[in-house]
């Protein structure tokens, strides 16, 4: 799967579940990196996603794939776009109109499109049963159904913390595990919409030197989905509160009794958590 920006993040978000159901290695790559690579498996399928359908790098990546004899699928959310002519097959991300430049529906819609594509292929190849297919769709729907409530809770949380957040000029977003893609996409959304200095890091990578630059003027946003690193990210937050006196905000399922934290009863289905934890950073 190749794509830039939101398209890449959507591919990364879908990757693990696609690998699981397809029982094969799945890669998410920036198009320009893929274009310059040299060693490939000859039985490769390349899915090139460009939401607006005009990404020159995604088109170049698809052309590279075709030149190597690979199967290609051109994906876009807008019909009649140039990218359609560079794939053997067209696959539309059917989300309707995106009314703002920064993609929101496009991110979630692309994740769902990648996943359902994988479910259908896996079912056809008898790698999953019809019951498993139906269960994946049911769980996906349950996760997506919570999105409006998450958005409403986020708006209330923002109004509570608006005065503090308006002072922010340097923000770090920290994430991990199944919501790594949400951290990356959330960082991009804040850059595009708020337009001040923001950086995003995977939890362990952040601990390799970056933490040295945190001080009392730094704002920290922790994307705290359930999982094996949940306690570790809470310890990191406590350290910065006690030692660096930074401004700290959690996105979490667990009641912290702290008005700075966005607490919501996320369904926390680990395979579909990416559909939920991104919403606060989109709003």
Describe the function of each predicted region:
Residues 1-142, 176, 211, 216-271, ...:
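Glycine-rich phosphate-binding loops that contact phosphosugars or nucleotide phosphates
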Residues 13-14, 183-185, 189-192, 279, ...:
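Conserved phosphate/anionic-ligand binding catalytic regions in large, soluble enzymes, centered on
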Residues 24-32, 152-156, 200-205:
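Short gly/ser/thr-rich secondary-structure transition/capping motifs
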Residues 33-36, 157-160, 206-210:
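Short acidic active-site motifs
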Residues 127-130, 158, 197:
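Short, structured loop/turn "capping" segments at alpha-beta junctions
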Residues 136-140, 146-155:
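Long, charged amphipathic helices and adjacent flexible linkers at domain junctions
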Residues 150-167:
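A short, well-structured juxtamembrane/interface segment
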Residues 165-232:
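Acidic catalytic cores of enzymes that act on phosphate-bearing nucleotides/polynucleotides
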């Amino acid at each position: 799967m190749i794509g830039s920006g939101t398209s890449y993040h959507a591919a990364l978000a879908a990757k693990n579940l696609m690998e699981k159901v397809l029982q094969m290695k799945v890669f998410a790559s920036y198009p320009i990196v893929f274009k310059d690579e040299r060693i490939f498996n000859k039985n490769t399928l390349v899915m090139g996603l460009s939401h607006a359908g005009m990404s020159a790098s995604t088109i170049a990546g698809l052309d590279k794939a075709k030149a190597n004899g690979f199967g290609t699928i051109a994906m876009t959310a807008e019909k009649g776009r140039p990218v359609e002519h560079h794939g053997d097959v067209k696959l539309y991300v059917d989300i309707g109109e995106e009314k703002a430049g920064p993609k929101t529906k496009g991110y979630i819609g692309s994740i769902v499109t990648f996943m359902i594509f994988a479910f259908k292929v896996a079912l056809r190849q008898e790698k999953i049963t019809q019951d498993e297919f139906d269960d994946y769709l049911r769980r996906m729907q349950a996760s997506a159904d919570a999105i409006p409530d998450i958005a409403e809770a986020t708006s209330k949380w923002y109004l509570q913390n608006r005065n503090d957040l308006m002072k922010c000029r340097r923000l770090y977003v920290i994430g991990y595990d199944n919501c790594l893609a949400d951290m990356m996409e959330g960082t991009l959304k804040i850059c595009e919409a708020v337009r001040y200095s923001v950086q995003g890091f995977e939890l362990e990578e952040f601990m390799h030197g970056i933490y040295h630059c945190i001080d009392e003027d730094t704002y920290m946003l922790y994307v705290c989905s359930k999982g094996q690193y949940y306690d570790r990210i809470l310890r990191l937050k406590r350290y910065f509160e006690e030692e660096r006196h930074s401004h700290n905000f959690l996105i979490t399922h667990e009641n912290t009794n702290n008005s700075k934290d966005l607490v919501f009863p996320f369904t926390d289905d680990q395979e579909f958590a990416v559909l939920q934890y991104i919403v606060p950073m989109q709003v």
